[in-house]
């Protein structure tokens, strides 16, 4: 277990080709974010004497909900928290939430943020930090914001995704970004192909390559870092964002 915060731990489980399941642990209870598959989650929880408190679902894609049913079969008292607007596609949810709803999970305040774009009903979960407890804010953002990138627009429009990223960009700059895929290196290589002289992109790319060579993930990042190196966050208007998204969709590394 690693990635310790004050009073809790956030642990990554890399699965499939590039998915990351995040396990948030406090006092022997676990919150699982977007479990693509169940087996490694069950093994980690049982191997560490943990019980499943709840599952947070950002959206309905199979590589985010594929392991949930088996997890609640093993821990039937666990809650599944998902967007009320996605009830027809995440039918096993037991707690349906809406935009700006505030939750209290294991003593931590969580705010639900609607971020349509990748899918029409995508949500993020924002853990509000505090100076008193020395906890940085945390955002579990699924496939909306990636390291140096953003999700493809399978259901939403460029306008929706631009507005969703703008909402995220209004969060505190020290917010830690816990996305659901390890795409950072490829995203930075794409960004460098557009801005080959950008020192921030170049430095982050070198750092990511070094981290990966040592067996570490490139995420979480901080929002302050995304503001410097993520072209989608840097986009000044919807038109610029749409052009970048189209360019990225057609880019071959």
UniProtKB/Swiss-Prot annotation:
Cofactors named for this entry: Zn(2+)
Gene3D superfamilies xrefs: Ribonuclease Z/Hydroxyacylglutathione hydrolase-like
The keyword Plastid is assigned to this record: no
SMART domains: Lactamase_B
Single GO BP term: methylglyoxal catabolic process to D-lactate via S-lactoyl-glutathione
Protein origin, superkingdom: Bacteria
Entry's cofactor comment: Binds 2 Zn(2+) ions per subunit.
Pathway: Secondary metabolite metabolism; methylglyoxal degradation; (R)-lactate from methylglyoxal: step 2/2
Amino acids binding Zn(2+) 1: 59, 61, 118, 143
Alphabetical UniProt keywords: Hydrolase, Metal-binding, Zinc
GO molecular function: hydroxyacylglutathione hydrolase activity; metal ion binding
Entries under InterPro entries matching the protein: Clx_II_MBL (IPR035680), Glyoxalase_II_hydrolase (IPR050110), HAGH_C (IPR032282), Hydroxyacylglutathione_Hdrlase (IPR017782), Metallo-B-lactamas (IPR001279), RibonucZ/Hydroxyglut_hydro (IPR036866)
Signal peptide region: none
Binding-site list for Zn(2+) 2: 63-64, 143, 181
Catalytic activity field: an S-(2-hydroxyacyl)glutathione + H2O = a 2-hydroxy carboxylate + glutathione + H(+)
Enzyme class: hydrolase
EC number: 3.1.2.6
Complex formation: Monomer.
Function: Thiolesterase that catalyzes the hydrolysis of S-D-lactoyl-glutathione to form glutathione and D-lactic acid.
Family stated for the protein in its record: Belongs to the metallo-beta-lactamase superfamily. Glyoxalase II family.
HAMAP family reported for this sequence: Glyoxalase_2
Protein name: Hydroxyacylglutathione hydrolase
Gene (name only): gloB
């Amino acid at each position: 277990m690693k990635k310790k915060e004050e009073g809790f731990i956030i642990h990554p489980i890399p699965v499939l080709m590039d998915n990351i399941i995040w396990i948030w642990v406090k006092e022997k209870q676990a919150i699982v974010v977007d479990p693509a598959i169940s087996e490694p989650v069950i093994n980690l929880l049982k191997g560490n004497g943990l019980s499943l408190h709840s599952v947070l679902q950002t959206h309905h894609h199979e590589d985010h909900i594929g392991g949930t049913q088996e997890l609640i079969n093993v821990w039937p008292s666990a809650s599944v928290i998902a967007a009320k607007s996605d009830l027809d596609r995440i039918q096993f949810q037991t707690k349906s939430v809406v935009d700006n709803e505030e939750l209290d999970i294991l003593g931590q305040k969580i705010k639900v943020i609607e971020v349509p774009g990748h899918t029409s009903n995508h949500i993020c979960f924002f853990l509000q930090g505090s100076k008193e407890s020395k906890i940085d804010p945390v955002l579990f953002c699924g496939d909306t914001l990636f390291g140096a990138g953003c999700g493809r627009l399978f259901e939403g429009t460029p306008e929706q995704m631009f507005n969703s990223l703008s909402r995220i960009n209004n969060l505190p700059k020290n917010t830690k970004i816990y996305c659901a895929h390890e795409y950072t290196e490829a995203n930075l290589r794409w960004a460098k192909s557009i801005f080959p002289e950008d020192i921030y992109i170049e430095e982050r790319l070198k750092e990511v390559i070094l981290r990966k060579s040592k067996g570490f993930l490139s995420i979480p990042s901080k929002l302050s870092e995304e503001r410097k190196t993520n072209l989608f966050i840097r986009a000044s208007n919807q038109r610029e964002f749409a052009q970048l998204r189209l360019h990225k969709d057609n880019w071959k590394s």
